[in-house]
Design a protein with these regions (language model features):
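Amphipathic alpha-helical transducer elements in NTP-driven molecular machines
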Residues: 10, 66, 88-95, 111-114, ...
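Conserved inter-motif catalytic segment of the P-loop NTP-binding fold
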Residues: 52-149, 157
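Active-site lining segments that contact anionic ligands and/or coordinate catalytic metals
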Residues: 23-26, 53-56, 130, 135-138, ...
Length: 237
């Protein structure tokens, strides 16, 4: 029987996001700087933990402090920006749940190479039923480039390594990747649209990923909102 995946916690909106299975693989999130990519992933993974009980590991260069990260996720779980009116007793079970379901990947003294990230994530995987590894953003990863190994080749090797590890262990690896410098559209004072081929460094982002989506902030006079565009879905009905 075909596995149509599970609800990521957005209710009816899930149909417009995606239905991941427990197969694992590679998901890429892209978007302009300050477009809300980290905020969306925090919200998504918060819902995944709360609604499905899945375990998430973060390698977050954006929010490296786990306590600050938990404080933000508590706000998301409560739907309140200000939690000052909640007592410690009220907050304790939420903090305890998050503390047990989310892990911050601590690289300590080692550089953030694909090998080191996977080695540390393997330690987490052996102690918890890990389902998601978040790398936010790719910009801070170190991939080896030299005269014999171009950036395109290095990115392809990194993506293949992450995807293979994810599929072997049924873990979704989500990598946040910025677009290259976008060109202005002819005759318009607007930048070209982001798609899966505008991700910086290599077309292999588009070629190898199982899912790709972009996040953008839309500002209008009648209100602001966040927009998600699903750019690639592999083998899903």
């Amino acid at each position: 029987e075909y596995d149509h995946g599970y609800d990521v916690g957005y209710g009816p909106l899930t149909d417009h996001v995606f239905h991941p299975t427990d197969q694992g693989g590679l998901i890429i999130e892209t978007g302009m700087p300050n477009s809300g990519k980290t905020d969306f992933l925090n919200d998504l993974t918060c819902r995944l933990m709360a609604k499905t009980g899945r375990y998430v590991c973060y390698l977050s260069f954006e929010v490296p402090d786990k306590d600050k990260h938990i404080a933000h996720l508590v706000q998301l779980m409560l739907g309140k920006v200000n939690t000052v009116n909640y007592t410690q007793e009220q907050l304790k079970p939420i903090v305890s749940f998050l503390n047990s379901h989310m892990v911050h990947l601590d690289l300590h003294e080692v550089s953030p190479t694909p090998d080191n990230i996977i080695a540390r994530a393997d330690i987490v995987r052996r102690s918890l039923p890990l389902k998601y590894l978040i790398i936010d953003p790719y910009l801070f990863m170190e991939v080896e480039t030299n005269r014999y190994n171009t950036e395109t080749q290095a990115i392809k090797a990194m993506l293949t390594q992450m995807q293979t590890w994810g599929r072997i262990h049924n873990i979704w690896v989500i990598i946040v990747a910025h677009p290259r410098s976008l060109k202005k559209q002819n005759g318009k004072n607007e930048l070209e649209n982001i798609d899966m081929y505008t991700i910086s460094g290599s077309a292999n982002w588009a070629n190898l990923a199982d899912f790709i989506f972009s996040i953008s902030r839309i500002k209008r006079q009648d209100g602001n909102y966040t927009r998600l565009d699903m750019l690639k879905v592999r083998d899903q009905d």
